[in-house]
């Protein structure tokens, strides 16, 4: 049959980060949000069995030659920007690719959403009763010099009208959880669909590795996931990442 996945972890000095997103999505879909929060802050050790199980779930296909294009050895060496190209080869090298909403920027020129490709919500477990968790990043605004005008501007940014101005800009990528927005204002069906996923979320959590200290979230977690897909066991990798946590406490 067809190979299910195209996966690439390569990203120059940041190689490994795409696998951290996989881990975060899996943790949100297998455990309650409080457990995710404990994992991110290391209140729950990185080598807790629940984290190891999540890593091995990722490995059940990422380390299986039958489930990933190019075989498991290609996962760590394929650049994440190149990995979706297998979707569009003839015949296709894979049927699915998991990545954030920006990934179409790296698709071959001329391919069209809804015609050459489409997307779906990363499924939640029907047996876990954890609702519809969504993982994401975003922009946060903060006041550095307080004034009435500044506060009025921030209030306006929370108003549907300001949101819809951004939504209407072609290719802006602007997604918003504001339930008062008019989805028809989006520049495309793709962004309407992506925004609907966000509106349907019962839980939202910020990217876990981005919340972790840099030595872990942009260090040992990245390299650990490369080590894991290259052959090390989940326990070995989790123990090493936990050691890096311990080293900064």
Describe the predicted segments one by one:
Residues 198-249:
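Conserved C-terminal helix/tail region of periplasmic/extracytoplasmic solute-binding proteins
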Residues 40-77, 122:
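Glycine-centered hinge/linker elements that transmit conformational signals in sensory
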Residues 1-44:
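Extracytoplasmic/periplasmic solute-binding protein
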Residues 1, 79-97, 223, 230:
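Short helices/loops that flank or line small-molecule/ion binding pockets
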Residues 120, 167-220:
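Long, aromatic- and glycine/proline-rich binding clefts that accommodate carbohydrate-like moieties
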Residues 24, 55-62, 85, 89, ...:
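Non-transmembrane alpha-helical segments in soluble domains
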Residues 102, 108-173:
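Extracytoplasmic/periplasmic substrate-recognition and gating elements
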Residues 1-14, 159-170, 247-248:
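Bilobed periplasmic-binding protein-like "clamshell/Venus-flytrap" ligand-binding domains
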């Amino acid at each position: 049959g067809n190979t299910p996945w195209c996966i690439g972890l390569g990203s120059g000095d940041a190689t490994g980060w795409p696998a951290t997103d996989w881990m975060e999505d899996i943790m949100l879909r297998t455990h309650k949000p409080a457990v995710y929060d404990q994992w991110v802050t290391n209140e729950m050790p990185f080598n807790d069995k629940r984290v190891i199980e999540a890593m091995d779930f990722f490995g059940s296909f990422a380390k299986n030659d039958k489930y990933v294009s190019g075989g498991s050895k290609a996962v760590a060496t394929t650049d994440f920007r190149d990995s979706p190209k297998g979707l569009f080869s003839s015949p296709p090298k894979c049927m699915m690719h998991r990545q954030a909403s920006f990934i179409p920027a790296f698709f071959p020129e001329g391919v069209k959403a809804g015609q050459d490709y489409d997307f779906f919500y990363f499924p939640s477990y029907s047996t876990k009763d954890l609702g519809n968790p969504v993982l994401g990043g975003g922009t946060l605004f903060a006041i550095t010099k307080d004034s009435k005008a500044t506060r009025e501007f921030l209030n306006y940014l929370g108003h549907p009208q300001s949101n819809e101005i951004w939504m209407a800009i072609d290719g802006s990528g602007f997604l918003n959880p504001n339930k008062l927005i008019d989805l028809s204002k989006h520049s495309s069906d793709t962004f309407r669909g992506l925004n609907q996923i966000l509106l349907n979320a019962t839980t939202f959590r910020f990217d876990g590795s981005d919340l972790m200290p840099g030595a872990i979230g942009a260090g040992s977690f990245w390299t650990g996931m490369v080590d894991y897909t290259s052959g090390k066991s989940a326990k070995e990798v989790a123990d090493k990442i936990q050691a890096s946590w311990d080293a900064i406490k």
